[in-house]
């Protein structure tokens, strides 16, 4: 037989084997899709019940349902791994197997998996039930929503904002710190068992594509694309930052540096994530009609249901479907009035089996009007790919899912659209000034959040990678916040805090880079859909509502779910395979030009050395080695605790004896910052019940002077080795370490010898005087041979005498 015959026979056998494997895999996946849908639905319903009614019983039910789903998924994942991907030709079957072969948390031991679930549930509960109390009225303790968020959205009181900001982090962040440390370790273990470098790498895997024709995409490429696009966005952000800083100086004139970073608690919400609420303080042309339509919504008696009905109308106008009847019956669109504790953070839910819901404590504001469009965009995506197999019912990548609703928000926010739904007067006319007002409001929400998002996720990636040891989490967090975002902490935070976890997405285990990529994608999508809708004019004026052609193109992409690479899905709509920041920059170009003119005489950028508390801080330098030599001890957390306690003692003494006031200062009232390895740091003091009430530096200095020796003694140091810069040394004797016995004995003996020598000298002088009185007039030196050069030791120059002391 010829060689070609055997080659043909081998190929036929290989094809038959592949066909057999593929058919078996197809049958396996069909069974999985049927069984998974029911178990997943039960788990999702239990999770919904817990999030809308936080009780121990609902937590127990959620954990039990989740455990059943996880056990089933783990079993099916192991079975999926028996099908070699190399023998699968059908792309859809292959993508499903690839997804199912990722074991997720099921690779952990039963004990560790249970512990991880316990940690995640605990973090969610702490976040949802945490409160901060008003220092001026300790009985007034507020949840985040509603309560603290109202202060952070509306208050112009610097101190009120500060206690709310600090109280939330002290209450929630500190509780979450030990849990988050465990979470990082367990998630990293899970990721590495799934063949990823760490959990950040695992998250980035959502963007990875292995495809032909140039549609592949790597996890490392995501990092590079984010870095590159951020560099392009940075000039626009820096000018927005400079403009906002100048406006904040008008509201808080003594609290803002002309060249410094922005205090984190002044930026419109609890995290400084969105600057939207700064618009009333920063509006360029205040005499123009207000494009924030919150007042109009209130005056027209809008409620939560009206807000979501208007969002639904928008989607329907472009040819997308209505919400289901179950959506309106089962969603939680307002905070319950029956006393239930709930997770208020807005989320869209695809529970499975055609059950779609939104959970949101909606308020009648323009911001929530746009948020409703965003959340309903998620539901539209969920409904569009519902016909896909279970494992492909997801966004092309996580950023796509976030972008869909944002596309609609771009149109819904335009003055033209707001006029059509009666929230702006028909007489409202657009000119250059109203255009700048509109673009600034958009930039506060969209541009202002990009560095926040980029920096937060970069920090987490570094933490998961081990590039930031847990002993430096907060130090690096605020270093990066100052350097990248131009935002500074209003009070210093040590390593007992966990500020990142004070954000919902961090406490609840969400990847966050999706909010960065979605912003880039949404402008790419908007530009493409506006072209399809035949929009003419600047991109920021485009409203795609009522364009069924644009809706049809969008729906084609949404219905793909995860069945094709996101690079291919993106290309089908926008004509490009990767992120491109140009449409975003084009959208804001008129504003960028205006900002550069406004900032012509202002400093653009920020000085990272400035701190809001610098003026009242005292610098400390400690020299252990020079003071104690080989007996120097290590400066550690315990020593810092002792220092803070010593200052608290000094403050108590000062207020008691000088002001006749009993103030219970404790170590937590002493705030330390900028600790350096060579032992230098700054500190300031606040009153015991109010972090926003800083004690003047001069009074702290007086308190230190009163208790200087007590402070020195606590550390076995003196004024020169425990130095408070700006406070002159006292006249108290320096601390001396104990002297050993042999030195004491030696000193006594040598002292006796010296006394003896002195007595001999004195005795000799007396005898000589007697001889002088009794002698004749002869030359007293006649008997002395001067050539011998003898010296009387009693008359030697003091500098020539050497001792062993």
From Swiss-Prot:
List the disulfide bonds in this chain: 133-141, 344-361, 530-542
Please give the biological process terms from Gene Ontology that the record holds.
Answer: proteolysis
Q: Where is this motif: SH2-binding?
A: 781-785
Cofactor(s) needed, names only, are:
Zn(2+); chloride
Region spans: Essential for cleavage by ADAM17: 652-659
Chain span(s) of sequence motif Endocytic sorting signal = 781-784
| A single GO molecular function term of this UniProt record | carboxypeptidase activity
Give residue numbers for the modification (Phosphoserine).
Answer: 783
Q: Which SUPFAM superfamilies match?
A: Metalloproteases ('zincins'), catalytic domain
Keyword field: Carboxypeptidase, Cell membrane, Cell projection, Chloride, Cytoplasm, Disulfide bond, Glycoprotein, Hydrolase, Membrane, Metal-binding, Metalloprotease, Phosphoprotein, Protease, Secreted, Signal, Transmembrane, Transmembrane helix, Zinc
Region annotated Interaction with SARS S protein sits at 30-41, 82-84, 90-93, 353-357
- The Phosphotyrosine modification is found at 781
Regarding the membrane, this protein is recorded as: Single-pass type I membrane protein
A family per Pfam: Collectrin
Locate the Collectrin-like domain: which residues? 614-805
Tell me which positions the record assigns to the signal sequence: 1-17
Membrane-spanning residues: 741-761
Q: What does this protein do?
A: Essential counter-regulatory carboxypeptidase of the renin-angiotensin hormone system that is a critical regulator of blood volume, systemic vascular resistance, and thus cardiovascular homeostasis. Converts angiotensin I to angiotensin 1-9, a nine-amino acid peptide with anti-hypertrophic effects in cardiomyocytes, and angiotensin II to angiotensin 1-7, which then acts as a beneficial vasodilator and anti-proliferation agent, counterbalancing the actions of the vasoconstrictor angiotensin II.
SUBUNIT field: Homodimer. Interacts with the catalytically active form of TMPRSS2. Interacts with SLC6A19; this interaction is essential for expression and function of SLC6A19 in intestine. Interacts with ITGA5:ITGB1. Probably interacts (via endocytic sorting signal motif) with AP2M1; the interaction is inhibited by phosphorylation of Tyr-781. Interacts (via PDZ-binding motif) with NHERF1 (via PDZ domains); the interaction may enhance ACE2 membrane residence. (Microbial infection) Interacts with SARS-CoV S protein.
The protein in question is named Angiotensin-converting enzyme 2
Which gene is annotated as encoding this protein in its UniProt record? ACE2
């Amino acid at each position: 037989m010829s060689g070609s015959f055997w080659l043909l026979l081998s190929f036929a056998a290989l094809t038959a084997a592949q066909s057999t494997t593929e058919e078996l895999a197809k049958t396996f996946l069909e069974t999985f899709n049927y069984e998974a849908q029911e178990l997943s639905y039960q788990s999702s319903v239990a999770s919904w019940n817990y999030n809308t009614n936080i009780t121990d019983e609902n937590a127990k039910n959620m954990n039990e349902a989740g455990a059943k789903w996880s056990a089933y998924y783990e079993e099916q994942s192991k079975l999926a791994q028996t099908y070699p991907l190399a023998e699968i030709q059908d792309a859809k079957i292959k993508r499903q197997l690839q997804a199912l072969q990722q074991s997720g948390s099921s690779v952990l031991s039963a004990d560790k998996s249970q512990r991880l679930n316990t940690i995640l549930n605990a973090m969610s509960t702490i976040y949802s039930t945490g409160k901060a109390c008003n220092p001026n009225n300790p009985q007034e303790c507020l949840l985040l929503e509603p309560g603290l968020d109202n202060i952070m959205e509306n208050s112009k009181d610097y101190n009120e904002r500060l206690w709310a900001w600090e109280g939330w982090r002290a209450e929630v962040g500190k509780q979450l710190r030990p849990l988050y440390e465990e979470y990082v370790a367990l998630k990293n273990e899970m990721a590495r068992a799934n063949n990823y470098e760490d959990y950040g790498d695992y998250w980035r895997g959502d963007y990875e594509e292995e495809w032909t024709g140039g549609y592949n995409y790597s996890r490392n490429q995501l990092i590079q694309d984010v870095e590159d696009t951020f560099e392009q966005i940075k000039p626009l952000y820096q000018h927005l930052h400079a403009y906002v800083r100048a406006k904040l100086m008008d509201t808080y004139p003594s609290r803002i540096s002309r060249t410094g970073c922005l205090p984190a608690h002044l930026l419109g919400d609890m995290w400084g994530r969105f600057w939207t609420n700064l618009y009333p303080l920063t509006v360029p042309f205040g005499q123009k009609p207000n494009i924030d339509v919150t007042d109009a919504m209130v005056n027209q008696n809008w409620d939560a249901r009206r807000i979501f009905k208007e969002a639904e109308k928008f989607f329907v106008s472009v040819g997308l479907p209505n919400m289901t009847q179950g959506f309106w019956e089962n969603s939680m669109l307002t905070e319950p009035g029956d006393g239930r504790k709930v997770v208020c953070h807005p989320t869209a839910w695809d529970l499975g089996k055609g059950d779609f819901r939104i959970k949101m404590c909606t308020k009648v504001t323009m911001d929530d009007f746009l948020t409703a469009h965003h959340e309903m965009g998620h539901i539209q995506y969920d409904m569009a790919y519902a016909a896909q197999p279970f494992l492909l019912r997801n966004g092309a990548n996580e950023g796509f899912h976030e972008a869909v609703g944002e596309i609609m928000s771009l149109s819904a926010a335009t003055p033209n659209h707001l006029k059509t739904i009666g929230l702006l007067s028909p007489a409202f006319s657009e000119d250059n000034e109203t255009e700048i007002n509109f673009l600034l409001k958009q930039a506060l929400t969209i541009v202002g959040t990009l560095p926040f998002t980029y920096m937060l996720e970069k920090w987490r990636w570094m933490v998961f990678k081990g590039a930031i040891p847990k002993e430096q989490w907060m130090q690096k967090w605020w270093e990066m916040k100052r350097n990248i975002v131009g935002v500074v902490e209003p009070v210093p935070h040590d390593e007992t805090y966990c500020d990142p976890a004070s954000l919902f997405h961090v406490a609840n285990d969400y990847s966050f880079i999706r909010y960065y990529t979605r912003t880039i994608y949404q402008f790419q999508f908007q530009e493409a859909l506006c072209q399809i809708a035949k929009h003419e004019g600047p991109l920021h004026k485009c409203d795609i509502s009522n364009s069924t052609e644009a809706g049809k193109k969008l729906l084609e992409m949404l219905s793909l779910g995860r069945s094709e690479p996101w690079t291919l899905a993106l290309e089908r709509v926008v004509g490009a395979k990767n992120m491109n920041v140009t449409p975003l920059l084009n959208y804001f170009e008129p504003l960028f030009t205006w900002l550069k003119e406004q900032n012509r005489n202002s400093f653009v950028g920020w000085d990272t050395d400035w701190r809001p508390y610098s003026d009242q801080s005292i610098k400390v330098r400690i020299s252990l080695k020079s003071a104690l030599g080989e007996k120097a001890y290590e400066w550690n957390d315990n020593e810092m605790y002792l220092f803070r306690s010593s200052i608290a003692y000094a403050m108590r003494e000062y207020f008691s004896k000088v002001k006749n006031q009993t103030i219970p200062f404790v170590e937590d009232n002493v705030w330390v910052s900028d600790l350096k390895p060579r032992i230098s740091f700054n500190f300031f003091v606040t009153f015991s019940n109010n972090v926003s009430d800083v004690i003047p530096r001069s009074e702290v200095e007086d308190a230190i002077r009163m208790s200087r020796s007590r402070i020195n003694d606590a550390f076995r140091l003196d004024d020169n080795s425990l130095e408070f810069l700006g406070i002159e040394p006292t006249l108290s004797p320096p601390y001396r370490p104990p002297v050993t016995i042999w030195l004491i004995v030696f000193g006594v003996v040598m002292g006796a010898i010296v006394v003896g020598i002195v007595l001999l000298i004195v005795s000799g002088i007396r005898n000589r005087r007697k001889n002088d009185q009794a002698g004749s007039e002869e030359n007293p030196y006649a008997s002395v041979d001067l050539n011998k050069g003898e010296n009387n030791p009693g008359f030697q120059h003091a500098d020539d005498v050497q001792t062993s002391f």
